[in-house]
Structures are given as structure tokens and as C-alpha cells.
A protein has these predicted regions:
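Membrane-interfacial amphipathic helices and adjacent loop/beta segments
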Residues: 1-30
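Non-catalytic C-terminal accessory region of glycerolipid acyltransferases
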Residues: 16, 20, 32-160
Length: 160
């Protein structure tokens, strides 16, 4: 799942590059039919990937949690999807260490669950846990966490 209006173009380029088994889906396309498709794909053993540290640039639901000692916005989407799809969550990271890339696949949550009245609280808790774990990896390799926008910028920073 991606936060880009260019998902269709990326899908075409992936196909041209021989990666036709990958499909990028724009998060704004999510509807009940696509959610059903995602559920069926997960049931077949396929994987769903979404960046847990990227919020939409304009609007979108996010949660502010502590990240490396500062409040930061993280998307609700990964946790909402995991709960709705009743699927486990893994962390996937890549670090360059001693000149070699190390791909890390780490089980993170067997299930994200909530009751109707505590959904927001549970999503905030999972987001905080994720931010804590991501922060540990960022401290381990601070030059390898890439953001191309002011991550900690808040709406308050826009005021004169």
C-alpha cells in the first residue's frame, strides 16, 4: 500500500522490470472490495506491506506518539488494517552494516485487536510500540533512516 497518486505508473514499471507479482495499491483506493481482496490474499499466504512511518503529506489519520524523545505523527492505517484484517504484523528493515546489507524481518504482533470502545486507544498503543522499536533501530544506524520531508514539523510550525 502506498501514499502516492502514481501507484498505477509504479505498477506498470514494476511489471516492465519483471516484478509482475507485486501490486502497489494507493491507500485512497481502499474500499470494501479491495479489503476483501486483501483478506483473500493474506489467506493464501501473500503479504501486505505498508510503511509504518510515513504519513500522507496532506491530511489523513495519524497518531502523535513519542519518537526519539519528541512527539511525532505516525499513520493509523497499518494498525487499523491489521486489526480489520486480523493478520499478524512483522517489521521489515534493511540496515547496511560493515559494507553489507542486512534485511531484518522481525515478528512484531500476532494480532492487533480492540473492542469497539477502545479502538483509538489500542491503535495509539500499537503505534507507540512501533515508534519505540523503530527508534531503537534508528539509534543503532542513525544515518540510515531516510525521510524526505520535515518529519517532526507540526501545524504549529506553520504559524508566523
Amino acid at each position: 500500500l502506498v501514499h502516492t497518486k502514481h501507484a498505477e505508473r509504479f505498477n506498470r514499471l514494476l511489471g516492465e522490470a519483471g516484478a509482475s507479482n507485486l501490486r502497489l495499491i494507493q491507500v485512497s483506493e481502499l474500499d470494501p472490495a479491495i479489503m476483501l481482496q486483501l483478506s483473500q490474499r493474506l489467506d493464501r499466504g501473500e503479504w501486505l506491506a505498508i510503511a509504518g512511518d510515513r504519513v500522507p503529506l496532506h491530511g489523513g489519520r495519524n497518531v502523535r506518539v513519542d519518537f526519539l524523545g519528541h512527539p511525532a505523527a505516525f499513520p493509523q492505517g497499518p494498525w487499523l488494517l491489521a486489526g480489520l484484517l486480523k493478520c499478524p504484523v512483522n517489521l521489515l528493515l534493511c540496515l547496511k552494516q560493515q559494507g553489507r546489507y542486512q534485511v531484518i524481518l522481525e515478528p512484531f504482533a500476532d494480532a492487533v485487536q480492540w473492542k469497539r470502545n477502545d479502538r483509538q486507544q489500542m491503535i495509539a498503543q500499537w503505534t507507540a510500540r512501533y515508534a519505540e522499536r523503530l527508534g531503537q533501530y534508528c539509534l543503532q544506524a542513525p544515518q540510515q533512516w531516510f525521510n524526505f520531508y520535515p518529519f517532526w514539523k507540526t501545524d504549529d510550525d506553520l504559524d508566523p
